[in-house]
């Protein structure tokens, strides 16, 4: 996908650990927190009051990284210093009014509302003539830098293709031109034959640990049918996507019986008004935890200076996740 190699070293997993241990967040959050900027009816830090929302709630980020007005700057004559203006829109998507929930604990019907909200935002944001890519993502847990525990994600829509997306598109397009088929469709069909890295499967989607996975329990959700973006899903596929989202996040929580941190995001076709037959809808999950609820994988040293390295094989990770219960551990307590 990115033309990058991964060093796999499963023999390192048992080395002694005297390094940093993550703090496990207390599991006693109220359903509504009067001090939370994202809870229904509360006033945010900029003085704007949230609506008394009952399911998904979307608003423009009060601290947007991207501005809708183009920022002008002086161009450098020296080609070693290259820069360009960027425009965009940042939004926050509250998944639920309930402060004490996360995606795996939500009802399936409510997760489906989140998926439909993502689709509506893809259409709305992509309709702007200067928006060429819509990045939907979630940072869950303080270990992934999440600034608020209320269940929420973000959408960053911008005029340029982000670097990771641009690299992915380049490789998807190269494969499509050479093989007249989707790279990810061919890939998921091969994985389904082998079954070694499959975690969950339903009629329309597959969750697997990718052959090239970097993070210990990294997974991808890949559609079985070839389509390029979230709005191409039919009603049945939307329900199936919500179900498999719940399925993998429940397994994540069950792994160490904790609210499992991760960064996740959808990769899909740009909104640049060009046909993109090379794009195949998929979603990435990058969780940092390695050995327990308190020990995470650090991408430092060799990983920063050389290439990514993992301490457990993709096949081992897939087997561990696959064998976990589909019922959330809290439901059994």
Feature map (PLM): residue ranges:
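Active-site microenvironments that recognize anionic phosphate/pyrophosphate groups
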Residues: 1-150, 156-236, 249-250, 261-262, ...
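Acidic/histidine-rich, metal-coordinating catalytic segments
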Residues: 264-268
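Extended C-terminal subregions enriched in glycine
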Residues: 240-259
């Amino acid at each position: 996908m990115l033309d990058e190699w991964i060093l796999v070293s499963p023999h390192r997993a048992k080395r002694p650990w005297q390094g940093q241990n993550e703090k496990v967040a207390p599991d006693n959050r109220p359903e509504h927190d009067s001090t939370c900027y994202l809870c229904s009816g509360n006033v945010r830090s900029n003085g704007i009051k949230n609506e008394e929302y009952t399911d998904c709630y979307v608003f423009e980020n009060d601290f947007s990284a991207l501005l809708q007005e183009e920022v002008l700057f002086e161009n450098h004559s020296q080609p070693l210093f290259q820069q360009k203006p960027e425009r965009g829109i940042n939004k926050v998507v509250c998944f639920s009014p309930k402060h004490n929930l996360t995606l795996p604990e939500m009802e399936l019907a409510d997760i489906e509302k989140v998926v439909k909200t993502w689709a509506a935002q893809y259409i709305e944001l992509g309709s702007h003539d200067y928006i060429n890519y819509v990045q939907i993502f979630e940072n869950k847990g303080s270990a992934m830098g999440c600034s608020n525990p209320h269940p929420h994600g973000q959408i960053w829509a911008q005029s340029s293709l982000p670097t990771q997306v641009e690299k992915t598109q380049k490789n998807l397009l190269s494969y499509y031109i050479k093989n007249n088929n989707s790279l990810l469709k061919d890939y998921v069909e091969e994985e389904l034959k082998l079954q070694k890295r499959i975690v969950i499967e339903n009629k329309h989607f597959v969750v697997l640990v990718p052959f090239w996975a970097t993070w210990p329990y990294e997974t991808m959700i890949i559609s079985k049918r070839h389509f390029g973006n979230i709005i191409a899903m039919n009603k049945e596929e939307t329900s199936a996507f919500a179900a498999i989202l719940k399925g993998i996040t429940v397994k994540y929580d069950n792994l160490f019986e904790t609210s499992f941190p991760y960064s996740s995001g959808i990769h899909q076709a740009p909104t640049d008004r060009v046909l993109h037959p090379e794009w195949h809808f998929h979603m990435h999950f990058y969780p940092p935890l390695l050995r327990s609820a308190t020990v995470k994988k650090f991408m430092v040293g060799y990983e920063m200076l050389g290439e990514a390295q993992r301490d457990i094989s993709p096949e081992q990770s897939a087997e561990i996740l696959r064998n976990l219960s589909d019922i959330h551990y809290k439901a059994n307590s």
